[in-house]
Amino acid sequence: MAASRAQVERVHTAAYVDVIAGLEVECMLTIDTVGGPTTLEASLLAVGCAIEAVETGGFAVVRPPGHHALVDRPMGFCIFGNVAIAARHAIGSGVERVAIVDWDVHHGNGTEAVVRDDPAIFFASMHQWPFYPFTGGPGTSGGNVLNVPLPEGSGDDEYARAFEAEVEPAVRAFEPEVVLVSAGFDAHEADPLAGMRVTAAGFRDLAARSAQLAPRVAAVLEGGYNVATLPALVRSALQGFESV
């Protein structure tokens, strides 16, 4: 089910939603983000799927992704902040604390910008550094935000150690009722747009670890640009979520 404008405007400005609603021809909204007449429909469906996932404990396989979207403009292939909106929806529906765990290869700068200093939402991001969007580097953690920058070439072992040493204790200390995963698969060893070495088994492990952090877990697809491997990686993550 498509999200409503009111749900989207929990995060984004009405003026920005108007811009997306008014697109009449295909165009470059930014240097890396395309829009057109069907962008609003696709984006509202993506947000709606993310909201349904957080309500039911599902995995929303959506496009466009969302974790780079800013409150008043698109960025990095992202139109609306699917996960940030779903987290705000959960809080508005009576959940007291939501933790977002983002393992996309890129820092979730849009999500962080939305939720930073929101005491009801914790945000943890594991990402390649230095790398686009060149945010979330060393020294940027604080309050309700944990950034875990990892060097190019990091694989299953490095991700597992970082998750166990940094992400897990921080999220457990927050005591979330819901964990919402920004599940990007562009840290895979065969992804063409990055330089990490995570395998299908590594994503299965990350999903299983994430599922142990709260009574309810949901996930939303972010990046993943090798279309030949992406379906198998999503299946591996689903196996991890379901193993707990």
Residue locations for each model-derived region?
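HDAC/HDAC-like amidohydrolase catalytic core signature
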Residues: 1-244
